[in-house]
Amino acid sequence: MPHSKHPSSHPHIIIYTDGACKGNPGPGGWGAVLRSGSHEKHIHGGEKLTTNNRMEICAVIFALKALKQRSSVELWTDSQYVQKGVTEWLEGWKKRGWKTASKDPVKNADLWQELDTLLPDHDISWHWVRGHNGHPGNELADALANKGVEEFLP
């Protein structure tokens, strides 16, 4: 699966994603920051009962769904689960019928399968950033994810 950048004929979008959960499982939220030139869009959402990893994947799914056209995407996540899932594990999971190397069912397969359908629509370079380390894009995505959590707190 190619993860290089598209020629300049496609818009260049920088995306920062994050997921959060109060309890794991518990109320969770996801957030994403999408930047194109001087334009910036913030999106967030959540679920009443979920896990942090599910929210991390949802952040990427909803960010990619928010793109209106094929784009060259630079995607930043603080989730090694998401970054490695896409760049290292996904192809093997598909070849094994959504089983891990140890023959166990892939956790969150429903979301991984949905994400997999979106990947061919864009040329994405995947980047990991250390969370809660002062990176402005990641901090903003984290704040949006926590806003998503708050909407589902009792």
UniProtKB/Swiss-Prot annotation:
SUPFAM superfamilies: Ribonuclease H-like. PROSITE patterns: RNASE_H_1. CDD domains: RNase_HI_prokaryote_like. Its EC number is 3.1.26.4. Mg(2+) 1 binds at D18, E56, D78. GO terms for cellular component: cytoplasm. It catalyses: Endonucleolytic cleavage to 5'-phosphomonoester. It holds the Pfam family RNase_H. Keywords: Cytoplasm, Endonuclease, Hydrolase, Magnesium, Metal-binding, Nuclease. It is found in: Cytoplasm. Residues 9-150 form the RNase H type-1 domain. Its cofactor is Mg(2+). One of its GO terms (biological process) is DNA replication, removal of RNA primer. Mg(2+) 2 binds at D18, D142. HAMAP family: RNase_H. Monomer. This is Ribonuclease H. It comes from Polynucleobacter asymbioticus (strain DSM 18221 / CIP 109841 / QLW-P1DMWA-1). The lineage of its organism: Bacteria, Pseudomonadati, Pseudomonadota, Betaproteobacteria, Burkholderiales. The gene is rnhA.
